[in-house]
Amino acid sequence: MVRMNRIVQVLLLGGLVVLQGCMFTTLRNELREMKHARVLTGRVLDQVRPEANVVLVLYRQSPDGLKIVNGTLLDSAVGKFVVKVPIGTFYLFAFEDLDNDLAWDGTEPNGYYGMPDAVVVTDSSPATLSGLDIRLNASAPPPGVFPETVSLPVEALGSSIVRAGQIADLDDPIFSLDYGNMGYWRPLTFIREIGFSLFFREPFDPGKIPVLFVHGALGTPHGWKDIVDRLDPDRFQPWFYYYPSGLPLDKNAAALNWMVAELHRELGFRKLHVVAHSMGGLVARDFILKNAYESRLDVVRQFVSISSPWNGHRLTAKGVRRAPAVVPSWHDMVPDSPFIRSLFARHLPEFVTYDLLFSYRGDCRFFLENNDGTVEISSQLDMRAQREARRIYGFDEDHGSILTGAEAIAQLVRLLSAPAGSPY
């Protein structure tokens, strides 16, 4: 699932000369574009027909007038939009697509941000411009400078970069290893095609406990298949966080927290279990802290980390120093990085039960101390993580096989199924 052994190979042999230069060239170009990109966020309010699709239209001011940049079909389970834009001047328009034709005929409920107001994005703008709410009106005429009708071709229809509640099968092609690699080496392309997504395997059932699975570097939700197949389908409903693992880990955690908070507001679930593998454990812990201390929610009741590098990976320091272009998440994975220190600056909330699973079968001793083939055991068993763990379980598996090993899966299922307060 995680393929972190590829990362290890990249960070070895004379300062990352294993990789082809084109990979770093692509990464460098994406990092340059990301540096100048900003995110617009807001909510579409006062929907007349809640079951109808809502289309967000992004206009950009040009010398020739207003031009449609793209359209975004909003996720009805969340009701908010998060769109990425370059430097420029933009206007936001939304409408209810009552007849599902990707067109506004002038009669469907619609609205603009402001009167409308321009959203000016410059190099000095913050990374996120929030609060750009749009209120729909059943009879509002368009301002004179805007067209009286709007028609979007399918190819112009983008999507919100943060999406929650979509139903997907784990065998869906978007969960292939190619997409996992894209999320690591070409995170901006991944955001355009997939976004930050929280997938369901089935429609939400208030009678079942959601179990949120968080993959690691280069991973996809498909890697959880063997574990999910062992869960009690009458008691649990699996959710899967799918994110660009090359981005800074705090951004991935923030996007996850935003989605969980919105889904909690919409669906009202009372409990959430979190299971994370490898680097995903760091993302998950940061999410849990944000969810409890910033969003003030107490829904996360159980957290299980699997083979997580709690003190990072020391070879990433070599990558940060020597690579022609640095994967942003490498900075966070440097041992004792500011991000890692922030993870343990606050304790997990008292209402969260934490169990630590680690793997110890590996033979990468020329470059690493005792390891599971990818991550050093000393990082998996960092004392800061051990101190907060209720129980610690070790398995004779390597970094990837722990997700398919029978004993590890059986123990994980027991932990998830045990009554509250149980020693297991």
What are these regions (language model features)?
Residues 275-276, 280, 284:
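Gly/Ala-rich beta-loop-alpha elbow adjacent to hydrolase catalytic centers
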Residues 212-216, 277-278, 307:
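The conserved beta1-alpha1 loop
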Residues 288-424:
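Helical cap/lid subdomain of alpha/beta-hydrolase-fold lipid enzymes
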Residues 35-54, 295:
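Structural motif
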Residues 203-271:
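Active-site catalytic motif of lipid deacylating hydrolases and related acyltransferases
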Residues 23-25, 43, 47-49, 57-61, ...:
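Flexible, membrane-associating and regulatory peripheral segments of lipid-active enzymes
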Residues 22-37:
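Bacterial Sec signal peptide processing site at the extreme N-terminus
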Residues 10-20:
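Bacterial N-terminal signal peptides
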